[in-house]
Amino acid sequence: MLFTIALVGVVLGLAYSLHIKIFSYWKRKGVPHETPLPIVGNMRGIVKKYHFRDINQRIYKKFKGQGPIAGMYMFFKRTALITDLDFIKQVMIKDFSYFQDRGAFTNPRDDPLTGHLFALEGEEWRAMRHKLTPVFTSGKIKQMSKVIVDVGLRLGDAMDKAVKEAKVEEGNVEIKDLCARFTTDVIGSCAFGLECNSLQDPSAEFRQKGREIFTRRRHSTLVQSFIFTNARLARKLRIKVLPDDLTQFFMSTVKNTVDYRLKNGIKRNDFIEQMIELRAEDQEAAKKGQGIDLSHGLTLEQMAAQAFVFFVAGFETSSSTMSLCLYELALQPDIQQRLREEIESVLANVDGGELNYDVLAQMTYLDQVLSETLRKHPLLPHLIRETTKDYQIPNSDIVLDKGILALIPVHNIHHDPEIYPEPEKFDPSRFDPEEVKNRHPMAYLPFGDGPRNCIGLRFGKIQAKIGLVSLLRRFKFSVSNRTDVPLIFSKKSFLLTTNDGIYLKVERV
């Protein structure tokens, strides 16, 4: 009995000592920081009372100007919130070799779809990035844009149908789901080579599965937050994050698609085809004894993981950007009309008035409107980089130890009045060429920057632009009695999303 009591005392003592060591880190470093609470650190109220961007804002506002970083604790994870734009450039570009990992959760052994490019680390990430970069060249995006334009036509038809049905509700149309169905059909075709038909059928299987990725959780939101802020510990515990049936759905979809194409000699200009070709190149090189390490090659599981993240990142981010853009344009009819006039003017000089990849480059105001949407509504509240070795902050005595997270508070930078006066105002002129030239390059980071920026940023922007043009050339958007002004955003979702649908009054032009 006494031995048991003594053992419990020793364990509790060790736990207390470890707790003190972790939560005194920034104090010992002499870095300004908020006093942490036991276990949760500075995450008190997360997902219930606060979103990540709210906690980041509190710390950013309190400590900006006191040094390049402010210390915080994301549960047990020691995190440096960066408040200095020059130091952000050091982390993301100049000293990238110290910060090449994201510290994101990945557990391919137990949860194969988490072995995707966004989360991979070190040489695994470098090898996969090298393989996938050719998939997202301008030439490849141009080929895929033809599919996106076709889906855009169906989007216009689906909106036309929604407008007819909405007459009984004073023209109210819920645009958030419609935009998500558009991007689901685009990604389904461009990534998997499948006709999802969710624009015609809102209950289509791919649309349902896409929705479930964000609405179904294997764990509570609090546990999810812990997993994603303590990724390595979660991996050691062999935790999974995706429901098994969703994993099985995407794994079988990729396997069946690959098997069918190889068996029947079918080729398409899509993401799956590019990965099939990359896999074949690896196998051919290995046969010739060129030293290709197939453990870094594209196994079926790796192919499924890359297709999965392409689907998740491609449909949710672009659809949210589109719906938020239309919302802002509904509030600013003059901006909406100027954009529509640009669209009509450019397309008037195209044979048949047909939209294509090349004419999008002529729509400069569209680019400004989209950029301002992503400035005001960045879909990720922050970017994370993890120190892969000890790093001394330039012109400072502060050394960030290996494993410390560096947090770039994107949302808070985008809403800093010293960088963007009247940050809550939607103003595309912020992205006039001269304005952009005079602004710090790290003041705008919707897609990150440096070697680990978003590999699919060009695809995402083209998809959103084609969707917006397809709608704005045919329809006018305005606020209605069901439009939330301001919008109410979810505190539970890591990505920026509204609690409810976005309702606008929609009329034919």
From Swiss-Prot:
PANTHER family: CYTOCHROME P450, CYTOCHROME P450 6A16, ISOFORM B-RELATED. It is found in: Endoplasmic reticulum membrane; Microsome membrane. Its EC number is 1.14.-.-. It is an enzyme of class 1 (oxidoreductase). It comes from the Eukaryota. This is Probable cytochrome P450 6a14. It is a peripheral membrane protein. Pfam families: p450. The gene is Cyp6a14. GO terms for molecular function: heme binding; iron ion binding; monooxygenase activity; oxidoreductase activity, acting on paired donors, with incorporation or reduction of molecular oxygen. Its cofactor is heme. Keywords: Endoplasmic reticulum, Heme, Iron, Membrane, Metal-binding, Microsome, Monooxygenase, Oxidoreductase. The keyword Transmembrane helix does not apply. InterPro entries: Cyt_P450 (IPR001128), Cyt_P450_CS (IPR017972), Cyt_P450_E_grp-I (IPR002401), Cyt_P450_sf (IPR036396), Insect_CytP450_Detox (IPR050476). May be involved in the metabolism of insect hormones and in the breakdown of synthetic insecticides. The keyword Cell wall biogenesis/degradation does not apply. One of its GO terms (cellular component) is endoplasmic reticulum membrane. Gene3D superfamilies: Cytochrome P450 (1.10.630.10). Signal peptide: none annotated. Heme binds at residue 454. Belongs to the cytochrome P450 family.
